[in-house]
From Swiss-Prot:
Key words of the record: Disulfide bond, Protease inhibitor, Serine protease inhibitor
Gene Ontology CC terms, in alphabetical order: extracellular region
Name of the protein in question: Bowman-Birk type proteinase inhibitor
Subunit description: Monomer.
Length: 63
């Protein structure tokens, strides 16, 4: 399934070294590698991962 593989379509990084990157994708769940997932109480929920990493995951959508 899509949720099991860590991926991100919209990733923002700072210009620092190492970069601080955050995935801004919003979906019904967060990817499997996400440690800090924040969801709204709406239905369906809108979740995003608030983890900060030094890299971006591969894009979820194959364009």
């Amino acid at each position: 399934s899509l949720a099991s593989k860590p991926c991100c379509d919209s990733c923002l990084c700072t210009r620092s070294i190492p970069p601080q990157c955050r995935c801004t994708d919003i979906g019904e769940t967060c990817h499997s590698a996400c440690k800090s997932c924040i969801c709204t109480r709406s239905f369906p929920p809108q979740c995003r991962c608030s983890d900060i990493t030094h890299f971006c995951y591969k894009p979820c959508t194959s364009s």
